[in-house]
Amino acid sequence: LGAVVNQRPDLCRLVMNYVPFVDVINTMLDDTLPLTVGEYIEWGNPNIEEEFNWMLAYSPYDNLEAKDYPSTLVRTGFNDSQVMYWEPAKYVARKRRIKTDSNPLLFITDLSSGHGGASGRYDAMRDLSWDYTWLCDQLDVKI
């Protein structure tokens, strides 16, 4: 989703991006992470120059530019073992610094969740209702 929004932000009115894998190059360079080596086949191996160049072409963090982006909500989980919480944090910080629009760019870190979001039924419903409320607000839907 991050790559699509970077390439064609005009296609989206808003973006809701959950535990996004946006710092592809840096993450895939760390072969001590549990999923890295096994996912070379999916994302590419940055230690191979040709694959590194492919990865650099789509990596959302590396392709942020000074331009307008749609309203965006990014959620991450502090205990996520698949997408480390600092990856989307770094992405949001950089995007806030360089974007040229005044659209909201919200970043929410759930300190008790992992990759699947809140684990308790009521916590998950709370998060979903918050997200839907934000979505309706951004689309000017009266509820």
Task: Describe these PLM feature segments.
Residues L1-I143:
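Active-site-proximal cap/loop segments of hydrolase catalytic domains
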